[in-house]
Amino acid sequence: ECQRIVLAAGLANAELAPMVGLQQSLKPQKGQIIVTEKLDQQMALPSLLLRQTDEGGLMIGDSHEDTGFETSVRPNIVSGIADRALATLPALADVGVVRSWAALRVMSKDGYPIYDQSEAMPGAFAISCHSGVTLSAAHAFDLAGYIAEASLGQELDRFSQRRFNV
């Protein structure tokens, strides 16, 4: 027996949440990225298109595709990402690409996270969002504290699945 259980299983939360009395309306959205070789110079600020890793490589990507659960890399999409990156930062023309890949984002109907606590099982929570990169600090600090205290708090009500029940 445990006092808390957190469902944070990505798209599988749609199937798992009903087991604890919750609903998570989720759909997949494919995104593709390019990763460059490591760069000595650090970018001052991330953008919506470019982010630099601690190791120095750039993660470049801004694609949004509705392909169901299909995750193959499409050269025309990767080429478009590269073209937009070069238009934004022409110095990238001399930077090598190390790899590219596609993955699925976990999307709610409105694109915002879903944070819910079960009324049927008060220690059970379901957490779904599309960006571990931008929301990871909130999840690691703020959200973890709410879960530890067994209450998400009224300020997170706007992120409940209930917002779709109108």
Predicted regions located by residue number:
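General beta-strand recognition
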Residues: 1, 59, 125-126
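Active-site lid/adjacent beta-loop-alpha segment flanking the redox-cofactor pocket in flavoenzymes
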Residues: 37-121
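Central helical "cap/lid" subdomain
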Residues: 2-42
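Short glycine-/acidic-enriched loop or helix-start segments at secondary-structure transitions
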Residues: 16-18, 45, 69-71, 136-137
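C-terminal catalytic lobe of FAD-dependent flavoproteins
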Residues: 89-166
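Glycine-rich, phosphate-binding/catalytic loops in enzymes
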Residues: 22-25, 77, 143
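Mid-domain beta-loop-alpha active-site segment that forms a flexible
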Residues: 10-12, 77-84, 128-129, 133-135, ...
